[in-house]
Amino acid sequence: PATEIIPTPRSVKAGQGTFDLGGGIRIAPADPLLRPAADYLAQLLREEDVAAAQDAGNANLSLELDPRLPQQGYTLKITPARIELRGGSCEGVVSAAASLRQLLWSGKGSLPALEIDDAPRFAWRGFMLDVARHFFTKEEVMSLTDRLACYKFNRLHLHLTDDQGWRIEIKRYPLLTRRGAWRTPNKHDSVCLRRAADERDPKFLLPEKNIRREQGKIRYGGYYTQDDIREIVAYAAQRGIEVIPEIDLPGHSLAAIGCYPQLACDGRVGWGKHFSTPLCIGRDSTIAFCKNVLTELFDLFPSQYVHIGGDEVERTPWETCPDCQRRIRAEKLEGAGELQAWFTRKTEQFLAAHGKTLLGWDEITEDGLTPQSAVMWWRSWMPSTLTAALQNGHRVIESPSEFLYLNGELDRNTLGKVYGWEPLPESLRAWEEGLLGIQANMWTEDVPTADAAGERLFPRLLAVAETAWSAPEKRDFADFRRRLPLHLHQLERAGWNYRLDDVEGVCDDNVFIGAATVRLLPPESAELYYTLDGTVPDTASQRYTAPFSITDSCTLTLRCYNRRGVAAEIRRASFRPTRYAEPSADAGNLQNGLLVRWYDYDGDNCADIDEAPLQANFITDSVVIPDGVTGNIGLICDGY
């Protein structure tokens, strides 16, 4: 039977009858390990106005661990009398709860009897949020985590540090957040603020909650205390999601260097030929700083993985730094490139000694790491780095910028492009076991608010969820679009913005004779406003309620607003009146049909046909190859 579950399950079998929700749900976890999952499920049920409590003595919903199932797999069985959730692990049971939750969205007081047998295609189904370029509060991260749980994501990667901000409390280095978490508005902020003004769109304003004023100056930023991190990690864990921290090393480190200048080779914050000033990894004190920061992470993040970045490092300062040159000689390295490789290997060893696994962007494939480290492939224009990582025995997470960087602007084609991407083409099948999974990323240089993030993320993130979970033969874009409206409604209900479908009924450029009738079809649940003078519409502009006529040249500017009053993207269409063209000469006596000229042309470029020898002329009543035309054929048809 057809369901509206995203990602689509492996198998759904219809049963007889329905389970009535009116009598409430009494939950019994069969294993103490499942009590957090039972608490979570009870919370989900209450959010859907279903009475729920744990009651082992009179239960009508059971949670069980079943070692016969795949570790992350689950079964969900609904009969008129009871509901059973089984998982190969606690994570599997939480995935079963996610499917049950989606059935509740369309249940309307009852649930259909059915049986779902399901398991993921990939073990790693991740999402990365950049909180360094623009900061997102603990509450916003937790709200997003809840959306991830709905769609069976199981990794949340937090990009906690970068040139533009340090977002996690490190008790040994208090300046990292006291100073490094705050900045004078920078070029990224200026781009956002200019867009907010030009487009009359508050979702590009810097949130007031992330601004403080010091001596009359505005400072933007924010950070997570260690207690905040513990709360986020626990919240995610209850939802089957592991939180991966990223501390970007040894590049992308200006926020740290600005607080502790001795971390840089020359003590200055700045930029090189391509990237920002890196850490001075020739000094033992810098290595100690890195180890001390990572050590504090170990107590906060239970995850096996620690992401160290490793990308886009400006190595030129190391070439003239006495400390770095001394390190290069002492370690018998060949230049600055090998110095970074040495640093990455040392960090790998340090993490391994603490039971952690190094994870980094695909640049680390050049650093001679052991196969125990994992690689996140992002440079879609360099597929060789993906195959190199797999050939070297690394576990790999695919995160290609072309398909899974969701911070880019959207259009009508981007959802299909994301959905249609295949992570495991035939060329990679030999290394299938090395592919841990896939991850979507949200970089936030021009994304200052949750509403701006939501418009970029949704519904594309749901497409990523289906690619990560469902087998290729189960994925169908038309069916995905069929299931989508329910989920968009739930996003809106949860306070999350999403990209509205395009307004139908108008082209970008329009030419008309006399008058043009404009018939627009806005997305469901949206209000459409427009102007005819090129200005940006808002809710004070003309609202579209019925077709209208245009008689003069103008620019029609359209913008939709969702139920929460959040503005969608702006679309412009030009209208220009014209008249029928006058004949360039007396047509003389005309015959019905098309004039077809046959040229002796054997090329493949239409523009060159009439340069070949003319063979004959014909009159035809349609676009056909006339009788008698053989050999090299180049035809040009004229008429109207």
Regions found by a protein language model. Give the residues of each.
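Hydrophobic faces of well-ordered beta-strands that scaffold small-molecule active sites
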Residues: 125-129, 156-158, 243-247, 306-308, ...
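Active-site neighborhood of glycoside hydrolase catalytic domains
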Residues: 256-262, 267-372, 379-388
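Flexible, acidic glycine-rich loops studded with aromatic residues
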Residues: 358-373, 379-517
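Active-site beta-loop-alpha junctions enriched in small/polar residues
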Residues: 132, 161-165, 248-252, 311-313, ...
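Feature activates predominantly on carbohydrate-active enzymes
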Residues: 69-287, 293-305, 346, 350, ...
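Contiguous, structured surface segment used for ligand recognition
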Residues: 1-124, 452, 456, 468-490, ...
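Short, compositionally stereotyped local motifs that mark structural "simplifiers"
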Residues: 28, 471, 475-592, 603-605, ...
